[in-house]
Amino acid sequence: MSRVSGDWAEAYRRKWKWDRVAWSSHNVDCYPSGCPLHAYVKDGKILREEQAGSLPQIEPGIPDMNPMGCQKGASWPQLLDAPDRVTRPLRRVGERGEGKFEPVSWDVALTEIADAMLDAIEEQGPESIIVPMTPEMGASPARIFANALGAVITDGSAEFHDFSPGFHLTWGVFNPVASMDDWFLADLTLIWHANPVYTYITMYHYLAESRYNGGEIVTIAPDFSPSAVHADYHQPIRIGTDAALALAMCKVIIDAGLYQKQFVQEQTDLSLLVRTDTGRFLRGSDVAVGDRDDQFFWWDALTRSLTSAPRGTLATTGVEPALEGSYRVLLADDNAVEVEPVFARLRRELDDYTPEKAGAICEIHPDNIRALARKVATRKTKIFVGCNSGKSYHGDLMERAMALLLALTGNWGKKGTGVRSWAVIGLDGQAFLTQK
């Protein structure tokens, strides 16, 4: 073996000489963020960073979150001394778009900005100042400043559409997700509008480990993405037709009687009664003068009578909410109206979404739609949804169709089910400082 020598060898040796090892992390717009890293320091400068792999196992039988960290974080020390790093204020000279700037002192920059803000406040009020939010977590101090000033803060999620409005509308919560290790427990994972092999580097291992655990992964994507390469199945789809696919799967499940009846009755609004004349929920104020507007009703198949749905619990104890049929109800004005469960209306709405019709829309063979629907209906299913759906026209309806698919199959509220949408982060730290 020949001896390696020269400048290159000496540079390599210097890489393995350091003064101390410190803890480091990067709190930027990736999730869960806060990867524990070791920073190797020499002469007061960071030589490099490495994954610490120091996280404990949270639950027996489930892999830990190690190692955490990616090449983006590993390259961060190079940016500290990069020649194009902006280290002082720059003021534009010339026209917008020319890319011409001149350096100015901090005093000059802060004074000019403050003067402009004061002029705007005096002339038009503080609401004339707009502070755009960014994906950078360092925006938290800017948010605090803007709130104190009375300025307008934009919705960062709306600006770059990394948000799932359909799920928000369905469940009424901003972030309806479990922790990342829950992916490991899914029997079936649908990767939809996402490419986690590239975009979720630190936590993708849970999806790979899920396969080792006996789970199955299906990537639904128009392209043969890196995440499709590592899936059990890749289902190509025509861009923008995801809602049709999800609704066709729902129709297959209902027609085959594969839906989870008790879950649908108890955990969804599909069992509540709707007036056929208005298409609105039957409400307490419809039935009795002075009753609540937020009181809804079931039709009890056991007593064959109208029954108030309890407002303090989802339990259907002693009641068998009907999912089919139409019924006559006497209103407070002594007029009778026809009502039916939401489920009955849903069944009719899905008549237009046969596998054949949806297959023509989505460019998917009908048998593939049927097979995928049966997989979802018979397994603990998690949908790994990326932010691409929020960037699609009617993306909210795509997400609501996905939520309906999970509702019919009882796939939320227990381990290994539900959706992974938007961010999965620890509810602590500067990202949530101004939201507490």
Regions found by a protein language model. Give the residues of each.
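Secondary-structure capping and boundary motifs in well-ordered enzyme cores
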Residues: 216, 223, 241, 350, ...
